[in-house]
From Swiss-Prot:
Recorded family membership: Belongs to the Hfq family.
A Pfam short name: Hfq
Domain (Sm): residue spans on this chain: 9-68
Naturally occurring in which organism (per UniProt): Salmonella arizonae (strain ATCC BAA-731 / CDC346-86 / RSK2980)
Database matches in InterPro entries: Hfq, LSM_dom_sf, Sm
Any one Gene Ontology BP term: regulation of RNA stability
A Gene Ontology term for the protein's cellular component: cytosol
Region (Disordered): 63-102
Gene Ontology molecular functions: RNA binding
Protein name (Swiss-Prot/TrEMBL): RNA-binding protein Hfq
Length: 102
């Protein structure tokens, strides 16, 4: 399973480290917005006015508000830690939308 996470972990870690606002679309169409506070193999903690634990199996798409560089610098492609935690995440307003109109 580490191979499948070699794309996921660097991407999510870059979003967490750089505190990039993200929109997370769930498989049922609901849109969540916030900043990734931390994540592990099964869940993502999304921070806004409240922290929400979002199970990865319920996620369809993660859309950053801006481009991020997520390439891993280590040749192994993995991380030595299975849990990633943001130190002092900022954010406000956990938002939930059934559908987005732009």
């Amino acid at each position: 399973m580490a191979k499948g996470q070699s794309l996921q972990d660097p991407f999510l870690n870059a979003l967490r480290r750089e505190r990039v606002p993200v929109s997370i679309y769930l498989v049922n169409g609901i849109k969540l917005q916030g900043q990734i506070e931390s994540f592990d193999q099964f869940v993502i903690l999304l921070k806004n006015t409240v922290s929400q634990m979002v199970y990865k199996h319920a996620i369809s798409t993660v859309v950053p508000s801006r481009p991020v560089s997520h390439h891993s610098n280590n040749a192994g492609g993995g991380t030595s830690n299975n849990y990633h935690h943001g130190s002092n995440a900022q954010g406000s307003g956990a938002q939930q939308d059934s559908e987005e109109t732009e």
